[in-house]
Amino acid sequence: MKNILKIWTAALIFIFAASCSKNSDTGISLSLKGTTTFPAFKKGATIEGFTFSEALLGIKEIEIKKEDEMMDDGDMDFDYDGSYIVDLLLGKSTPALGFSEFLPGTYNKFESKTASVLDGGKSLSVKGIYTDAAGTAYSFDVSTTSKIKFEFESDTAFVLTEGTVLDMLINLNLPMLFEGVDFSKATANGSGIIVINDLTNSAILTKIMSNIDQIANMEDEHESEHD
């Protein structure tokens, strides 16, 4: 039987499922995935009309830190180092994030840094179609080469015990990247696609990056009981 704990913000949902390992392994198996739905307590704040065809994130470092870490002490950090291309639509990464050994303890802080490892030196690439309430469809292609740091700290920590492997799934709400974006004010290219990057429709990218900044620095708003 698995013990399941959910910790979420409006944009990020952390789901932990702990089960006893059949061997002596102690650690975390990590995956990231995009989502287009909100937690139940945010149902009144939906952002509808999005269909995504691509959502890629370049990652170079992920750190999960102990609750009692008072200083930036490398001995207290347990991380995934390397270059990862995360497909948020499929919930898979190349290479796979998979399992990493951690010391038993109480953890409550997550940090991640993006890297420009996607094609064209991008750190984020999101493509799709947005259809507004009037039925007008806008094809978009959003990308940036900027480095993004995600930080999340929760009052509700999770405990990793000896001989336990913790399955950790992080869901990122993709429509929230576009909150407050008016596609009707964007300029489309010759193919009718709204390209949004550091050089084209840059004012819209500034708004999207502002949304990302808010997403990237959040504390939990709600936590569920163990199921």
Model-derived segments and spans:
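A short, solvent-exposed, low-complexity linear motif enriched for acidic/polar residues
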Residues: S21-D227
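C-terminal motif of bacterial Sec signal peptides marking the signal peptidase cleavage site
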Residues: F16-S19
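Bacterial N-terminal signal peptides that target proteins for export
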Residues: M1-T9
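Short, linear, compositionally biased motifs with a strong N-terminal bias
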Residues: A11-F14
